[in-house]
């Protein structure tokens, strides 16, 4: 893959039809892009080494060892060597973690990520901070977020993880999923369990977690907008009633909508500045999300797009809805029973592409609509759904 003036076009790798190269390119792209959260840039040597790994010439471990050796033997010292060394080593470590398939949703995993990400960079890698911290933020005009107390860090992490582990995503549409994920991720970040490297560690943990619950997050959002991601986390956790500033997850939600739903919300750091001058204020046209017809990044194992329905109020061209209506018929089915009836296993994707569209278009309803989380909740066809089912049973060719 060609390079021009030290620039690597990582996105080209996703278009060449070689999945392994595309995966390695995504890992390096994200790893390099995340250095921007601390104002760091990688060296040209790192970029050249990354390309060698992407092309399959060397392994990721060989790439990391080359980077380590490069700084050990470098004789021509430059003023920014220390910063470059951190960026290069951390990029290699992050690329390795992202490329790995294993993941465990736990506090030890988060701590382990920090240790492996900053191995050879921070002496305190993998250690919870022993003191309280403040950080002046540009986006807050020099003010700081209130971070977690040093005495409570592990307890706070365990609590947030357990709350997320127990959270039930069933029945949620993607708007609700994004809103919840934004709150969870911002909560973990607000604890700020480490002395340094919290945002990079949080980003890597988030990527691995999203993948573990079925999302494809290989669209380079973390690579291109890592600084925005950090500032959005700041705004989601900052409140100053005296100055009229409330916690605002809107910016983080826009990031996740772009990441998970394929939207194209404008991600500009200046829009997040608290009490901005008029020329930097968010234009009215950017406050609303830009909807996409279907999410561009979604859990795998079901159709990659939601077919649009036609204009008739009693039928639809959406094959997912047709399949679900046919499966339910005159029965009342639980979510688990519906998954079995349509032959799918990925619950979140089924919700996004089949059940939610069927309910929003009025073909399927809840048996207990006033109690969505009823322990014996079932789903059944509406009058409209029954009319469609009758048509389908008369003309089975519509399902083909």
What do these predicted ranges mean?
Residues 1-400:
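FIC/Doc superfamily catalytic core
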């Amino acid at each position: 893959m060609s390079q021009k003036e030290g620039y690597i076009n990582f996105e080209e790798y996703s278009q060449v039809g070689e999945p392994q190269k595309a995966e390695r390119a995504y890992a390096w792209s994200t790893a390099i892009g995340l250095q921007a959260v601390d104002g760091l840039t990688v060296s040209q040597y790192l970029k050249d080494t990354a390309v060698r790994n992407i092309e399959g010439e060397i392994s990721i471990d060989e790439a990391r060892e080359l980077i380590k050796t490069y700084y050990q033997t470098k004789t021509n010292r430059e003023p920014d060597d220390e910063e470059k060394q951190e960026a290069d080593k951390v990029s290699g470590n992050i690329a390795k973690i992202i490329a790995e398939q294993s993941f465990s949703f736990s506090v030890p995993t988060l701590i382990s990520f920090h240790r492996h990400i900053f191995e050879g960079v921070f002496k305190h890698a993998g250690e919870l901070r022993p003191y309280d911290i403040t950080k002046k933020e540009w986006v807050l005009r020099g003010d700081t977020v209130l971070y977690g107390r040093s005495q409570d860090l592990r307890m706070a992490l365990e609590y947030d993880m357990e709350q997320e582990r127990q959270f039930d995503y069933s029945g949620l549409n993607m708007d609700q999923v994004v809103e919840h994920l934004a709150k969870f991720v911002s909560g973990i970040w607000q604890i700020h369990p480490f002395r340094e490297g919290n945002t990079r560690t949080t980003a890597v943990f988030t990527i691995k977690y999203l993948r573990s619950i079925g999302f494809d997050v290989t669209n380079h959002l973390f690579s291109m907008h890592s600084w925005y991601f950090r500032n959005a986390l700041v705004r989601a956790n900052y409140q100053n009633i005296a100055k009229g500033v409330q916690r605002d997850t809107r910016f983080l939600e826009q990031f996740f909508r772009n990441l998970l739903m394929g939207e194209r919300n404008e991600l500009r750091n200046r829009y997040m500045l608290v009490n901005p001058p008029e020329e930097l204020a968010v234009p009215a046209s950017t406050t609303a999300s830009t909807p996409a017809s279907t999410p561009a990044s979604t859990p795998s194992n079901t159709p990659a797009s939601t077919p649009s329905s036609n204009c008739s109020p009693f039928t639809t061209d959406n094959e997912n809805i047709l399949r679900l209506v046919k499966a339910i018929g005159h029965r009342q089915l639980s979510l688990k029973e519906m998954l079995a009836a349509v032959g799918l296993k990925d619950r979140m994707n089924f919700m996004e592409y089949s059940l939610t569209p069927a309910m929003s278009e009025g073909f399927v309803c809840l048996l207990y609509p006033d109690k969505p989380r009823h322990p014996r909740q079932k789903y059944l066809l509406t009058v409209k759904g029954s009319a469609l089912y009758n048509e389908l049973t008369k003309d089975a060719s519509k399902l083909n």
